[in-house]
């Protein structure tokens, strides 16, 4: 990703990163609606308009959305909601590995883990699946505060999943992985 961004900058493009809703929110009361297409799309279109307003004539009125993973999904959403940047000309989207088809990802990952004989790889896959699921649940709790992690995860995993409201992907994944290793060794 850094190489791609560097290439865009070298070619003279302005690169703007969205400020996704709920990330870094100081009170901790507003959760990030992880993988909520409209929220992500609005973050991108708002960022594009703000950058153009700030830079004025130093920036073109043409824009493209490019993203990877969650950003890939956000870029697809920006295409859907491009009209929000009404005074600018939307030129297209490049979505790299957008988050999509969760059923396939989760069932495929579980099948892969089930066939894996190497414990490290098995736990790596399962911890990753649990991490994404927990982040999705955290995002769903923003509009649905009565949704409980125990409705999705069994105890004690539900307690780890609650950390999705404050931890980033890597830290949360390590917590799931550590618990899985402890369970495997018991």
Q: Which residues are covered by each model-predicted region?
A:
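Short amphipathic alpha-helix adjacent to the substrate-entry channel of hydrolases
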Residues: 1-15
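Stable alpha-helical elements in mature extracytoplasmic
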Residues: 4, 40, 44-47, 71-78
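Short beta-to-alpha linker loops that shape the active-site pocket of alpha/beta-hydrolase fold enzymes
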Residues: 14, 19-23
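Glycine-rich "HGGG/HGxG" loop immediately N-terminal to the catalytic nucleophile
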Residues: 22-33, 49, 74
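Alpha-helix capping and helix-loop boundary segments enriched in small/acidic/polar residues
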Residues: 31-39, 65-70
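Alpha/beta-hydrolase active-site loop
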Residues: 33-55
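Primarily recognizes the serine-hydrolase "nucleophile elbow" in alpha/beta-hydrolase
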Residues: 50-121
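Accessory cap/linker subdomain of secreted extracellular hydrolases
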Residues: 99-186
């Amino acid at each position: 990703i850094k190489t791609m961004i560097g290439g865009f900058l070298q070619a003279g493009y302005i690169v703007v990163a969205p400020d996704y809703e709920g990330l870094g929110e100081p009170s901790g009361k507003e959760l990030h609606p992880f993988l909520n297409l409209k929220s992500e799309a609005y973050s991108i279109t708002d960022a594009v308009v703000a950058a153009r307003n700030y830079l004025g004539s130093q920036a073109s009125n043409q824009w493209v959305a490019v993203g990877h993973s969650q950003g890939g999904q956000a870029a697809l959403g920006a295409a859907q909601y491009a009209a929000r940047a009404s005074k600018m000309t939307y030129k297209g989207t490049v979505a790299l590995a957008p988050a999509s088809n969760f059923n396939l990802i989760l069932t495929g990952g579980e099948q892969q883990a089930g066939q894996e004989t190497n414990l490290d790889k098995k736990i790596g896959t399962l911890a990753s699946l649990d991490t994404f699921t927990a982040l999705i649940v955290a995002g769903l709790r923003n509009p649905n505060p009565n949704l409980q992690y125990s409705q999705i995860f069994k105890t004690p995993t539900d307690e780890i999943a609650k950390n999705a409201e404050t931890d980033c992907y890597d830290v949360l994944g390590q917590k799931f992985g550590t618990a899985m290793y402890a369970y495997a060794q018991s």
